[in-house]
């Protein structure tokens, strides 16, 4: 049904739902119109991956213009990102048109999609809205829904877009096979070349194609450490195989802010660079390894460079490559509605390191910003982003032919395609071996299989053990890395910005004084109540995030074995459990859906809110140490692995309130053992050092960022 080239000279065919049955040669032989249409599908997937990133405080909706003329919107409501069922149908209708099977019975087609969407349950993967609720009214006014009747609005990353496409396609293919009327009709390539194998579902066939593609891609790569030499021969071996030779498209070097309004589009050629930009230096062929600079996650640029080079095919396949750039360069952030570009970055063979990009929604092109800019201030405080061309300046990624945006997986509860953690401990090693066969081998797989056979591992351990190799300082001895990890744990408990702690597991020797990234006030920890867990469970993610909408992971099999990758390109962390990825993504999106009913303070984790509630209980004269049934259920999180995996050294730690005086009072009470606020179990804290509370409070105050918006309050 489909073929896979296994010779080392040809790159493996990209395994996308539309073309996974075609060989590389067949894909290259597709008509030009079909290739353009499939590229437009990739542009949509890029938006589906990246829409919740880099939002401004006054922004509550971000739109993507489909080639059909309709918009798909990402809506921020109650600190969660949503997509409507109507927009999901619009995405799928466009994808079928690009696939060569335009919809001819839209009503029946839409009914099938909404039937599939019933598998996404409210409260877990969607928000059930009452008729004419403020949220539905907002969606209706922005053309996201057609009616304000009672309906579910889905969490952004809970929607399995590719699975919905394959399920809808399979329904129509079965109808055609039985002689019934289908909702779509094949009129062009690649739909005309699609051969349906009814012995197994299309989703299973795609999964097997993904696995076979991953294996063949791995066989082409040599496991060398990232080279820092100037020899292109050695660099070619530790980078991705070169893309097909295509003529470079000239990248315009300037653009201007866009005017407000829906139709205020400026011709691309007439746009000028935003004021205040420094002169653009020549892009160097080789990165400068003599100086150490840090990206927004606190990872040195050369370490990020190594991460991209050493990321296995598994990581390359599921993580988008281009770097995000703050919307400082355009005027998107100055209005409530944002528009996304029509295309992700295209290849530019003549350039050195693949640059970051600025979006232009008019033409669908991106303006390149050199990686090596003299003025860091031009990035609005963001330190330089790492070159993202996988360590090979000679070979930039080709978005039209390589594995990119292959599978967008939503909620694991969709049609129960992924089992919960019900595998017996003895089977964990087998699961690890299975994952190693289907995904690229990682040196830490053996450690994970041993750890999993003993018991669950705290998320802090996972972040180091299973991050891409380049994220951890490979040039440091393990003892030194562990020592610095413990030091980072202590610092993170007393004022380290969350974005730097959780966003980069390998950030050990970063000078925190230079970090310009914020830490929300409710996430500052004080030494008041650090009494909860043994320090052995700690790690760089000792301050972690709460349950979130389900986030996409990568599809490598039914076993819970590190199959979830952070969709943010500059991060790329891997997680075994989807719940951990959900919490981690909130460090990027700054969602805080848990609101205190007493003071309306927002929290990103339910256990943080539960701990905060206890401060109110203590203020009312109660101990506040016993959780109610509802709080305990929230505190336990989504998974059922017990307290070990869910535990965090600061999960029950006290949080600084909005009043500096109350924070000082709590700090003073924590230093007097006779106080009623002291934990009845002060054992673990008896060996912890005492910190100056003013110093603790002052450190995060050097960092400023507007608080995340609550669109509900704006209405």
Swiss-Prot record:
Q: Mind telling me which GO cellular component terms the entry cites?
A: nucleus; Ste12p-Dig1p-Dig2p complex; Tec1p-Ste12p-Dig1p complex
Repeat among the record's keywords? yes
Q: Where is this region: Disordered?
A: 214-243, 439-469, 518-539, 632-691
Say yes or no: keyword Ribonucleoprotein present.
Answer: no
* Any one GO BP annotation for this protein: sexual reproduction
Zinc fingers, C2H2-type, are found at: 564-588, 594-616
**Outcome of gene disruption:** Impairs pathogenicity on rice and barley leaves but does not affect appressorium formation. However, fails to penetrate onion epidermal cells and to cause spreading lesions. Reduces significantly the expression of the cell surface sensor MSB2.
Please note every region of biased composition (Low complexity). Answer: 214-224
Q: Which molecular function GO terms apply here? A: DNA-binding transcription factor activity; zinc ion binding
Bias (Polar residues) ranges: 648-679
| Top-level taxon of the source organism | Eukaryota
Q: Which UniProt keywords apply?
A: Metal-binding, Nucleus, Repeat, Transcription, Transcription regulation, Virulence, Zinc, Zinc-finger
Query: In this record, what's one Pfam family?
Result: STE
Which InterPro entries does the record cross-reference, listed alphabetically?
Ste12, STE12_transcription_factor, Znf_C2H2_sf, Znf_C2H2_type
Gene3D superfamilies, per database record = Classic Zinc Finger
Q: Mind telling me which residue stretches traverse the membrane in this protein?
A: none
Compartments annotated for it: namely: Nucleus
Q: What does this protein do?
A: Transcription factor that may function downstream of PMK1 to regulate genes involved in infectious hyphae growth. Is not essential for vegetative growth, conidiation or appressorium formation. May be involved in the regulation of the expression of the cell surface sensor MSB2.
Tell me the protein family, please. Answer: Belongs to the STE12 transcription factor family.
Protein's UniProt name: Transcription factor MST12
- This protein's gene is called MST12
């Amino acid at each position: 049904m489909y073929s896979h080239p296994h010779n080392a000279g040809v790159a493996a065919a990209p395994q996308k739902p539309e073309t996974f049955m075609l060989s590389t040669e067949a894909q290259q032989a597709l008509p030009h119109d079909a290739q353009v249409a499939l590229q437009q599908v990739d542009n949509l997937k890029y938006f589906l991956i990246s829409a919740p990133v880099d939002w401004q405080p006054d922004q509550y909706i971000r739109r993507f213009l489909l080639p059909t003329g309709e918009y798909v919107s990402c809506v921020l409501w109650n600190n969660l990102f949503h997509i409507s069922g109507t927009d999901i149908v619009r995405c799928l209708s466009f994808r079928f048109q690009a696939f060569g099977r335009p919809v001819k019975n839209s009503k029946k087609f839409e009914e099938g999609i909404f039937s599939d969407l019933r598998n996404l349950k409210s409260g877990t993967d969607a928000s059930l809205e009452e008729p004419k609720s403020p949220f539905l009214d907002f969606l209706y006014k922005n053309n996201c829904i057609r009616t304000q009747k009672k309906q579910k609005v889905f969490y952004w990353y809970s929607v399995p877009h590719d699975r919905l496409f394959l399920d809808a396609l399979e329904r129509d293919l079965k109808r055609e096979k039985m002689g019934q009327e289908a909702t779509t009709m094949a009129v062009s390539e690649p739909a005309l070349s699609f051969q349906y194998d009814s012995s197994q579902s299309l989703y299973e066939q795609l999964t097997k194609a993904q696995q076979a593609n991953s294996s063949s891609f791995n066989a082409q790569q040599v496991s060398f450490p990232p080279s820092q030499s100037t020899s292109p021969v050695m660099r070619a071996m530790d980078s991705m195989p070169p893309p097909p030779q295509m003529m470079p498209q000239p990248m315009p070097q300037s653009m201007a802010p866009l005017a407000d309004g829906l139709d205020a589009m400026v011709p691309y050629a007439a746009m000028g660079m935003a004021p205040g930009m420094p002169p653009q230096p020549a892009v160097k062929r080789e990165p400068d390894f003599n100086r150490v600079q840090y990206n927004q996650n606190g990872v040195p640029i050369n370490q990020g460079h190594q991460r991209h080079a050493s990321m296995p095919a598994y990581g390359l396949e599921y993580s988008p490559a281009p770097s995000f750039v703050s919307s400082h360069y355009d005027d998107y952030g100055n209005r409530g509605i944002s528009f996304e570009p029509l295309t992700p970055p295209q290849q530019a063979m003549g350039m050195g390191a693949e640059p970051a990009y600025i979006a232009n929604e008019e033409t669908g092109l991106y303006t390149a910003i050199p990686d090596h800019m003299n003025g860091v201030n031009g990035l609005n405080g963001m330190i330089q982003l790492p070159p993202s061309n996988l360590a090979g300046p000679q070979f930039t990624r080709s978005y039209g032919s390589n594995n990119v945006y292959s599978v967008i997986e939503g909620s694991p509860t969709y049609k129960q395609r992924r089992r919960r953690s019900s595998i017996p401990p003895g089977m964990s090693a087998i699961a690890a071996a299975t994952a190693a066969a289907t995904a690229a081998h990682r040196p830490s797989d053996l450690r994970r299989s041993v750890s999993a056979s003993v018991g669950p591992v705290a998320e802090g351990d996972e972040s180091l053990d299973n991050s891409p190799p380049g994220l951890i300082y490979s040039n440091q001895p393990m003892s030194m890395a562990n020592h610095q990890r413990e030091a980072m744990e202590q610092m993170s408990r007393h004022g380290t910005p969350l974005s730097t702690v959780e966003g980069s597991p390998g950030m050990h020797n970063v000078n925190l004084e230079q970090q310009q990234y914020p830490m929300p006030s409710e996430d500052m920890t004080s030494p008041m109540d650090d009494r909860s867990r043994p320090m052995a469970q700690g790690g760089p993610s000792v301050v972690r995030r709460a349950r979130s909408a389900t986030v996409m992971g990568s599809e490598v099999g039914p076993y819970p074995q590190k199959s979830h990758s952070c969709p943010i390109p500059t991060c790329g962390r891997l997680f075994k459990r989807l719940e951990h990825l959900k919490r981690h993504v909130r460090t990027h999106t700054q969602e805080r859906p848990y609101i205190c009913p007493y003071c309306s303070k927002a929290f990103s984790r339910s256990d943080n809110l539960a701990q905060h509630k206890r401060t109110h209980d203590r203020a009312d004269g109660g101990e506040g140490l016993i959780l109610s049934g509802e709080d305990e259920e929230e505190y336990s999180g989504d998974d059922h692995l017990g307290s070990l995996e869910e535990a965090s050294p600061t999960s029950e730690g006290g949080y600084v309130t909005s009043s500096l005086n109350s924070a000082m009072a709590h700090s003073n009470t924590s230093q007097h053992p006779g106080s009623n606020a002291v934990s009845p179990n002060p054992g673990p804290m008896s060996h912890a050092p005492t910190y100056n509370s003013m110093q603790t409070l002052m450190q995060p105050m050097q960092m400023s960022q507007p608080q995340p918006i609550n669109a509900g309050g704006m209405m």
